[in-house]
């Protein structure tokens, strides 16, 4: 799911940046701060700056922040390689290998949250804690009207949008914009399901953050939380490792602008 957020000015510069080889492509990354590593996975069509520009300075005060740009996004070149969640999750692991990071906390927003779920399933030994922000692990996690929009999306929707402006500012080849859009739109329109049974096997602590009107089906969200071990009476049994925060009066896009709120939940969870 995506929309056209306003551009966000990043307040600090990375301590290092570069490209890591990953499954036949070069994945762009930026590193900030020192401490325990936390990996940030952005939403569809976003760049690091657009998605995480306000949150990185806060996280980097006490942690090593590694922000990636997924296949075709931002600085990472467009590729005809098939766009699959399993391959993108493997790309994350390859970047970790390149940066010599054994394990890390992973934070994913929207499309990046889907990749974070996939990473948790296929690379559990590399995951410490998982933060999912307004993201689902199956198509049915979105409201029907959201899935209907995915199936009707056209490249023209993004013409001259802040998303295109952000892409043009950093993409190695701006002429790939339409090909990139076609690839992403095709992926968004395909039903997917990582599996209830698989989600229930995630052993890492999980924090889910959702906006009350972010397009996620809240009945499905409650089921997801239950699969992860939440939704219990903690007065009669131990507090679960899973946490759920539903932020009032927030849409899918506006949620990521609530930097202070999101940081307070994430910072407390990752302690």
Regions found by a protein language model. Name each.
Residues 255-268:
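Post-His helix in hydrolase/transferase enzymes
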Residues 25-75:
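Conserved HGGG/HGGXW glycine-rich cap/lid loop of the alpha/beta-hydrolase fold
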Residues 1-38, 62-63, 271:
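Alpha/beta-hydrolase fold catalytic core
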Residues 202, 208-210:
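Short beta-strand/loop motif that positions the catalytic acidic residue
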Residues 114-122, 128-164:
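Flexible "cap/lid" loop of the alpha/beta hydrolase fold
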Residues 60, 67-107:
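Active-site loop/oxyanion-hole signature of alpha/beta-hydrolase fold enzymes
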Residues 57, 212-250, 256:
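Conserved loop-alpha-helix segment in the C-terminal half of the alpha/beta-hydrolase fold
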Residues 183-198:
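Active-site nucleophile elbow and catalytic-triad environment of alpha/beta-hydrolase enzymes
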């Amino acid at each position: 799911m995506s929309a056209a957020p306003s551009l966000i000015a990043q307040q600090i510069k990375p301590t290092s940046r570069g490209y890591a080889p990953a499954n036949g492509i070069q994945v762009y990354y930026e590193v900030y701060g020192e401490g325990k590593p936390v990996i940030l996975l952005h939403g569809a069509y976003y760049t690091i700056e657009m998605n995480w520009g306000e949150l990185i300075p806060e996280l980097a005060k006490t942690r090593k922040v590694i922000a990636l740009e997924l296949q075709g996004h931002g600085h990472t070149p467009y590729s005809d390689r098939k766009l699959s969640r399993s391959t993108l999750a493997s790309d994350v692991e390859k970047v970790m290998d390149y940066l010599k990071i054994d394990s890390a906390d992973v934070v994913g927003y929207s499309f990046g949250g889907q990749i974070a779920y996939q990473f948790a399933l296929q690379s559990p030994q590399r995951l410490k804690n998982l933060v999912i922000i307004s993201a689902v692990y199956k198509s049915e996690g979105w409201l029907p009207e959201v899935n209907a929009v995915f199936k009707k999306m056209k490249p023209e929707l993004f013409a001259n949008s802040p998303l295109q402006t952000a892409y043009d500012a950093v993409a190695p080849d701006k002429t790939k914009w339409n090909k990139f859009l076609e690839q992403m739109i095709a992926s968004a329109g395909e039903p997917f399901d990582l599996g209830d049974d698989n989600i229930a096997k995630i052993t890492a602590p999980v924090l889910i953050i959702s906006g009350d009107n972010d397009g996620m089906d809240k009945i499905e969200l409650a089921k997801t939380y239950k699969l992860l071990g939440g939704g219990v009476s903690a007065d009669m049994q131990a507090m679960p490792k899973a946490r759920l925060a539903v932020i009032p009066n927030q849409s899918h896009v506006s949620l990521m602008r609530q930097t202070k709120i999101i940081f307070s939940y994430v910072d407390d969870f990752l302690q």
